[in-house]
């Protein structure tokens, strides 16, 4: 195996992670003409459903950016209401315990619904806009280290080390800023010693599935929240 190492041109910003957050930032800065280095450790955009919901105010923002039409071209689901279901006491089955509007009246939003669309399709909308502005996400690459020294290089103080996921290539980039958009397992955040404040990680379990469902469940087009209580915390009558 031959290792190829190189030093890249200085960048205004290095972005690690090409999920919706990293891509949104990259899209905004690319439109303003900034030099961006954007890497992601996956060979392709997200292949399955993950964070598939676009909130009403986010859709407003996408409209202002001229990207809403590209999102809506995929004919996403529009959710106007959320329903909650709980186990039906001592009997079998579940019962609806409440509903509320997906976008309550007190929220100042142009679109009163949550938009549901495969995350990979959302990412591709941003990626298409990036290409128009001369930015390509470098895949599959990851960050391996970084340091900052303003005394050594006050204009581009951040030194970022990147490598191909198979270890055959490495790069060193100098930048003004480094942005970690890698999600829960962020290398950047961990190296900076920034923890995540959250509740008991086993208190709630989420499941996400992609599929075509044949069902008579009454709230299938609403956005149901079915709550299952663990044995240790079942409510007592």
Language-model segments: what does each one mean?
Residues 3-21, 37:
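Beta1/beta-strand and adjacent pyrophosphate-binding region of the FAD-binding site
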Residues 47-133, 147-153:
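Active-site-adjacent segment of FAD-dependent monooxygenases/related oxidoreductases
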Residues 136-138, 197:
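General small-molecule cofactor/ligand-binding pocket signal
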Residues 9-11, 166-177, 181:
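Core beta-strand elements of the Rossmann-like FAD/NAD(P) dinucleotide-binding domain
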Residues 128, 177, 181-237:
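Conserved FAD-binding catalytic core of PHBH/FMO-like flavoproteins
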Residues 28-50:
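Glycine-rich FAD pyrophosphate-binding loop
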Residues 139-158:
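A conserved short coil-to-beta-strand element within the FAD-binding core of flavoproteins
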Residues 26, 62, 123-126, 130, ...:
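Conserved structural-core and active-site-/substrate-pathway-adjacent residues in large, well-folded domains
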